[in-house]
Amino acid sequence: MDPRVAWIQPEQKGPANALWMQIWETSQGVGRGGSGFASYFCLNSPALDTAAAPGAAGRAAPAAGGPGPAPAASSPPPAPGPAALPPALLTALGPAADSARRLHKSPSLSSSSSSSSSNAESGTESPGCSSSSSSSTSLGRAGSGRTFFSFADGAAHAHPGPRGSTPAGSPPQHQFHPGRRKRENKASTYGLNYLLSGSRAATLSGGGGPGAQAARPGTPWKSRAYSPGIQGLHEEIIDFYNFMSPCPEEAAMRREVVKRIETVVKDLWPTADVQIFGSFSTGLYLPTSDIDLVVFGKWERPPLQLLEQALRKHNVAEPCSIKVLDKATVPIIKLTDQETEVKVDISFNMETGVRAAEFIKNYMKKYSLLPYLILVLKQFLLQRDLNEVFTGGISSYSLILMAISFLQLHPRIDARRADENLGMLLVEFFELYGRNFNYLKTGIRIKEGGAYIAKEEIMKAMTSGYRPSMLCIEDPLLPGNDVGRSSYGAMQVKQVFDYAYIVLSHAVSPLARSYPNRDSESTLGRIIKVTQEVIDYRRWIKEKWGSRILPSPDLDNRIKIKERITTCNGEQMQSREPSSPYTQRLTLSLSSPQLLSSGSSASSVSSLSGSDIDSDTPPCTTPSVYQFSLQAPTTLMASLPTALPMPSSKPQPAASRTLIMTTNNQTRVTIPPPTLGVAPVPCRQAGVDGTTSLKAVHSVTSPAIPSASPNPLSSPHLYHKQHNGMKLSMKGSHNHTQGGGYSSVGSGAVRPPVGNRGHHQYNRTGWRRKKHAHTRDSLPVSLSR
């Protein structure tokens, strides 16, 4: 069982798990190196469940704002280190465990192995050092009395003193496999099977003594009992999104990092312009996501080395973390902020992301369920170290385009509705890209409504002599550019998607209701887990930046965010005012009860990550657009006045008289509402007043809880194998279709219920259709585009 792909499921736990892991290790030739230690051993621990959190909170009360002293302003983020190995792991390793105990690491070894595969591509070497492995250590100590899962005890308290120093009485930090940089990824669950292979009491609880810790399932978002089947998965995805969505403290911390780097840039080039792009601009970032910056100026060549020296001089970044990738497609500087451990990628004169950011934000408005899928999929790939191209995964831009294409071409549902089942969509996404999609012959097209096209057709428009890659995605903004051309590990991603489909489809099947652990185990937790390191890191951020959330001084006037709760019976009401001449926009959370209110003074450019720029998108020229994200705590929203009524959105154009059954234009048959009514969906309308330079009004709605589908696991794209669909002539008057069917949803109207009429009625003559046109409410067949 590959620890990078699959986990031991709750029903599979037993005494033979450790033996099966050893058999897999022997068959793969793993662990036969010089040290005899498994290089993929997981360094992170699963997070405590919400039910067990009070005990952990009690132990960490002094550091969390209790009677103890407050953390120092200069204290680094928690950096837990491992101690003794679990008994189950020692049994699984056998003779390798003795080598693991004697395993030491010198600074020279850390220096030589700390360079990533990105440096190998660029041909540049940075001064190597590793603060987490600078001292010679051993993995286990006989008298330590600490278990492998005691990370949270040391992580709950911020360690004072300089970085790299080991406090007295605490286990030294060690990096097991720096070549893969597992230690830098706090969310990594690589090798989690070793922690799951032993008995639950010995492995997850650290023994059965009185001081044993609570079980760590790694599902801190699970705070209630969910419905059975696919409906429960839908509810759990919503809770996961609300739990992992960025909080105002995290946004404030990232703005401070940007401000420090911007100060260094302004000292060098006073006329330079520093802008933000990437997930920070769109709000689709995880707690450990990086920050992408672009510096605009007048240079013939990007001054990478000059900025690198300035960053070292001002001690902005960890000296060992600064890497210059000057041989990449787009030269960038990669660094890690010294105070917050946030990774930052800096590029020069890269304006490609401006249009890409607007493109993704427009689709986020069009598909209100898109952010939920993206956040789950990002976490799914991040914990498996498949979220970047140079680590063998795919870029976030490729992932977003795949999700957009999936929603565009879904044959049965209208993805623009806010009451679709997220659990159904997630399972079908894994089924499509894990099993059904033909990566060898098919490419993905997003523009013009979306389509699946042959790679031969894409190759005709390819530039620079490139051939279509395994994961071929046509760039919707740059024709001829293949977004996934550098994703050499696309088949690995396909494998994990297939694994996720198998696990989730079994978990939501009717047979799963007979499992003895059906009420205690998390369905989403079978494929996604949150580590305790991420939880401690977020708690440290909230403690340190909780008192710094103030209105941004860069805004001209105060911004008041207003919220009005209404009910819209499952329909999403979207209305917004024209944007200002300064092209500043407001990005709001689509589901969280906390609206975004803390202003960001930095500008956004794109939703691409640093690896996307490095490998996927060639540079182009386009005007700069300043963006920022606003967030607000829930307590502030209760005292704000209600918003004024806002006009409805632009109505959809009238449908044409020809129905083309292709991937671009699809036939949708409305289904009569179920007998069990769906509860009205609370919708929030948020308006922004106060300045003339900022005008944005968005409707924010939480996805409703739809009724369970009778066939939740059918293939989502069975109707898209043909590229040239037949045309059906629609005779008679079609003027009445504009007010009903599919087009009425886009204009904010309520869709009237339509009976389930058979297809034989469409063979009527034209005069009879005209005669009864005024008696119909709407046609059961509506045109999508």
Curated annotation (Swiss-Prot):
<dbReference type="Pfam" id="PF03828">
    <property type="entry name" value="PAP_assoc"/>
</dbReference>
<comment type="function">
    <text>Terminal nucleotidyltransferase that catalyzes preferentially the transfer of ATP and GTP on RNA 3' poly(A) tail creating a heterogeneous 3' poly(A) tail leading to mRNAs stabilization by protecting mRNAs from active deadenylation. Also functions as a catalytic subunit of a TRAMP-like complex which has a poly(A) RNA polymerase activity and is involved in a post-transcriptional quality control mechanism. Polyadenylation with short oligo(A) tails is required for the degradative activity of the exosome on several of its nuclear RNA substrates.</text>
</comment>
<dbReference type="GO" id="GO:0046872">
    <property type="term" value="F:metal ion binding"/>
</dbReference>
<dbReference type="GO" id="GO:0006397">
    <property type="term" value="P:mRNA processing"/>
</dbReference>
<feature type="compositionally biased region" description="Low complexity">
    <location>
        <begin position="86"/>
        <end position="98"/>
    </location>
</feature>
<feature type="binding site">
    <location>
        <position position="378"/>
    </location>
    <ligand>
        <name>ATP</name>
    </ligand>
</feature>
<feature type="compositionally biased region" description="Low complexity">
    <location>
        <begin position="106"/>
        <end position="145"/>
    </location>
</feature>
<dbReference type="GO" id="GO:0009410">
    <property type="term" value="P:response to xenobiotic stimulus"/>
</dbReference>
<feature type="domain" description="PAP-associated">
    <location>
        <begin position="421"/>
        <end position="480"/>
    </location>
</feature>
<feature type="compositionally biased region" description="Low complexity">
    <location>
        <begin position="593"/>
        <end position="611"/>
    </location>
</feature>
<dbReference type="GO" id="GO:1990817">
    <property type="term" value="F:poly(A) RNA polymerase activity"/>
</dbReference>
<feature type="binding site">
    <location>
        <position position="481"/>
    </location>
    <ligand>
        <name>ATP</name>
    </ligand>
</feature>
<dbReference type="InterPro" id="IPR045862">
    <property type="entry name" value="Trf4-like"/>
</dbReference>
<dbReference type="GO" id="GO:0060212">
    <property type="term" value="P:negative regulation of nuclear-transcribed mRNA poly(A) tail shortening"/>
</dbReference>
<comment type="similarity">
    <text>Belongs to the DNA polymerase type-B-like family.</text>
</comment>
<feature type="binding site">
    <location>
        <position position="353"/>
    </location>
    <ligand>
        <name>ATP</name>
    </ligand>
</feature>
<comment type="subunit">
    <text>Component of a nuclear TRAMP-like complex, an ATP-dependent exosome regulatory complex consisting of a helicase (MTREX), an oligadenylate polymerase (TENT4B or TENT4A), and a substrate specific RNA-binding factor (ZCCHC7 or ZCCHC8). Several TRAMP-like complexes exist with specific compositions and are associated with nuclear, or nucleolar RNA exosomes.</text>
</comment>
<dbReference type="InterPro" id="IPR043519">
    <property type="entry name" value="NT_sf"/>
</dbReference>
<keyword id="KW-0539">Nucleus</keyword>
<dbReference type="GO" id="GO:0005524">
    <property type="term" value="F:ATP binding"/>
</dbReference>
<dbReference type="GO" id="GO:0005794">
    <property type="term" value="C:Golgi apparatus"/>
</dbReference>
<dbReference type="Pfam" id="PF22600">
    <property type="entry name" value="MTPAP-like_central"/>
</dbReference>
<keyword id="KW-0464">Manganese</keyword>
<feature type="binding site">
    <location>
        <position position="397"/>
    </location>
    <ligand>
        <name>ATP</name>
    </ligand>
</feature>
<feature type="region of interest" description="Disordered">
    <location>
        <begin position="56"/>
        <end position="184"/>
    </location>
</feature>
<keyword id="KW-0460">Magnesium</keyword>
<keyword id="KW-0548">Nucleotidyltransferase</keyword>
<dbReference type="InterPro" id="IPR002058">
    <property type="entry name" value="PAP_assoc"/>
</dbReference>
<dbReference type="GO" id="GO:0005654">
    <property type="term" value="C:nucleoplasm"/>
</dbReference>
<dbReference type="GO" id="GO:0031965">
    <property type="term" value="C:nuclear membrane"/>
</dbReference>
<keyword id="KW-0547">Nucleotide-binding</keyword>
<protein>
    <recommendedName>
        <fullName>Terminal nucleotidyltransferase 4A</fullName>
        <ecNumber>2.7.7.19</ecNumber>
        <ecNumber>2.7.7.-</ecNumber>
    </recommendedName>
</protein>
<dbReference type="GO" id="GO:0070568">
    <property type="term" value="F:guanylyltransferase activity"/>
</dbReference>
<feature type="compositionally biased region" description="Basic residues">
    <location>
        <begin position="757"/>
        <end position="774"/>
    </location>
</feature>
<keyword id="KW-0067">ATP-binding</keyword>
<feature type="region of interest" description="Disordered">
    <location>
        <begin position="593"/>
        <end position="625"/>
    </location>
</feature>
<feature type="binding site">
    <location>
        <position position="292"/>
    </location>
    <ligand>
        <name>Mg(2+)</name>
    </ligand>
</feature>
<dbReference type="GO" id="GO:1905870">
    <property type="term" value="P:positive regulation of 3'-UTR-mediated mRNA stabilization"/>
</dbReference>
<feature type="binding site">
    <location>
        <position position="396"/>
    </location>
    <ligand>
        <name>ATP</name>
    </ligand>
</feature>
<keyword id="KW-0507">mRNA processing</keyword>
<dbReference type="InterPro" id="IPR054708">
    <property type="entry name" value="MTPAP-like_central"/>
</dbReference>
<keyword id="KW-0808">Transferase</keyword>
